[in-house]
Amino acid sequence: MDGEGRWARYRMPDAAIDAAAREEVDGPVIPLSEAGASIRTYVRQTPEARKPVGYDRKFLDRYRPNASFYLTEQDRTHLAAVGRPQVVEQPAGTYAKQILSRLLIDLAWNSSRLEGNTYSLLDTKRLIELGEEAVGRAHLETQMILNHKDAIEFLVGAADEIGFNRYTVLNLHALLANNLLPDPTAVGRLRHIAVGIERSAFHPLEVPQLIAESFDQILATAAAIRDPFEQAFFVMVQLPYLQPFDDVNKRVSRLAANIPLIKHNLTPLSFADVPRQTYTEAVLGVYELNEIALLKDVFMWAYERSAARYAAIRQSLGEPDPFRLRYREQFRQLIAELVRARVGRKDATARIGAWSEQEIDSRDREHFAEIVEAELIGLHEGNFARYRISPSEFAAWRQVWEAR
């Protein structure tokens, strides 16, 4: 970001542009529709050759949930066919939890890569799993990836509670923007300043009241959409176009697109292999032309890649344990209580036994207690968020647990 205060401009570093151009040549090529190719041709002109445009509220107003669609019926049917795992009805977020360790790395790395982050996939894996910061990388890049990890864990861990509402999206921004904005008070808050986008002819909305009104309209519209894939793509289009936050808008839209997928136990969208230049051009097409065809080409291609990837991963994992599934809430409740109470190794067995006697069927108590003890032993900084434990609560408990 260049500048602070009333006017800030967001720009892509020259080195990142060069990297994106190389990636376009060397990496995967997304097949484009005729309309998508036309949009790309337009946005590849110099900014001076493109028509200056401002935010057009009518682009949002024209959309009527479940009456007008960005994705055709054929598109939605196809995405459902490739993205719906062959599993029995399960609680929201079950599928994402099964593949969480891979999703954390894939989505954190790819979403950060689309912002110009230079961490490698291996660097990202070591950072997320071991907490090891890559040598020679900017702290900003490390922070960006860790923020993605926190945000993904929030969405998956609170799958029953998230949705297209202010609580979810503002907190999603707070997690993704943590320690990255010049103004710390702008984290999780709608934009009060004017912003510009470097190398674009688009001028975002400036009036805070109108930003808030449009933001609430986007959320209400998204919440009313019945099809989860249409919901996902709608927020990928409309959230960045509004630029509701000082920065980090596209990151919010990419993770928000996963909200309906997580809630409906569909394959998540990790943006694996998406060329950065194509994605950037697709977003510019929405900004400057209010045309979605190129972004839709990216979305459809990226989702098919994600579906194939996670189908293979899930197959290697096998079916979920039905016992763990049945007592999912009880496991989460008890482990969270034990951690918050800072229960040590010596007292854990007795506390688990007493709790189980009150809450668990007598036939299942012994097995339930065994699993809780194993979970406590295996609890570490990379997996405690699934029990809705804060970092400070985990750290305080861990100190007691490790004491001899």
Each language-model region and where it sits:
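FIC/Doc superfamily catalytic core
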Residues: 1-404
